[in-house]
A protein has these predicted regions:
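Membrane-embedded alpha-helical bundles that constitute the cytochrome b-like, heme-associated redox core
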Residues: 1-272
């Protein structure tokens, strides 16, 4: 499960890179939604064919989410077997730092579920926003129109022009949670997340009994924490600069194309 969870991110990272390029970087360069549409169509020939979309987009996403949920269930089962499901009052819990277990003797009921980390929590939130994004931009056109050949950056711009509040909430959540989850996820895979943290208490970072070395370790943890969070903020800002700064301001589509877009949004209760 751990390998599936990890290796599924490789294909998703390639897709995400292409998607950021076409929905943010290229619009930033061209400063125009119509001028950017052609590049998006070219990219679709790579990741939106009948063969590549299931293999390199849909399957990795499904595998990543399913394996993440399965890992939590497995760890819960292991906790129950290790500490005994019949004695929840003495179920060990993670300390406030989340690094180690400590036995409880206060008689309160404890959960066997593993602690929900920031990476996991952001992943579940991201999955919800991503599901809505896929439903509106991919599944809805297929269901209503039979294909999605007319769906592109102009469709997104039309959504922002017609329903700005819903669109901004959806895309801010998608970009913020998505970039945070992906950056911290990769930091975990390469071993940086385990060395990052702002907390500087002895329980969190431990002690070497050398005051100078302890200070250096705490400073290093904080530097790594700042670098990872800074990378997440930078990634979000780059994506938002083109996506929200250019595409979202592209204005509504007109003519029969605009009518098609209105009918699609009306199908999910977003009519005028």
């Amino acid at each position: 499960m751990t390998r599936i969870h990890r290796y599924s991110t490789y294909a998703l990272s390639i897709f995400t890179g292409l998607h950021i390029a076409n929905t943010s970087i290229i619009p930033l360069v061209t400063r125009s939604v119509p001028a950017s549409e052609g590049y998006l169509l070219l990219a679709r020939e790579i990741y939106q064919t009948p063969m590549t979309e299931p293999l390199f987009v849909a399957l990795p996403i499904a595998a990543h989410i399913a394996s993440g949920i399965a890992l939590r269930l497995v760890r819960r089962s292991q906790n129950l077997k290790r500490y005994g499901g019949a004695t929840p009052a003495v179920m060990p819990t993670r300390s406030s730092t989340g690094r180690s277990f400590s036995s409880s003797s206060d008689g309160s009921s404890r959960s066997a579920w593993p602690q929900l980390s920031w990476v996991s929590a952001s992943g579940y939130g991201f999955a919800a926003f991503l599901s809505a994004h896929v439903a509106i931009n991919r599944l809805l056109p297929l269901h209503v129109e039979g294909d999605s050949s007319n769906i592109g950056l102009a469709y997104v711009a039309h959504g922002f022009a017609s329903h700005p509040a819903v669109s901004y909430v959806a895309y801010v959540g998608l970009l913020g949670l998505g970039c945070g989850h992906m950056v911290w996820g990769w930091a975990k895979w390469i071993g940086l997340a385990q060395m990052a943290g702002w907390a500087a208490d002895i329980k969190t970072v431990g002690t070497t009994r050398d005051r100078n070395e302890d200070v250096r370790r705490r400073k290093r943890r904080r530097r790594i924490w700042l670098w990872v969070n800074g990378t997440a903020v930078a990634a979000t800002a780059i994506w938002a600069a083109g996506g929200l700064g250019i595409v979202a301001r592209g204005g509504p589509a007109h003519g029969w194309v605009g009518k098609v877009y209105d009918e699609l949004f009306a199908a999910v209760g977003l009519g005028h």
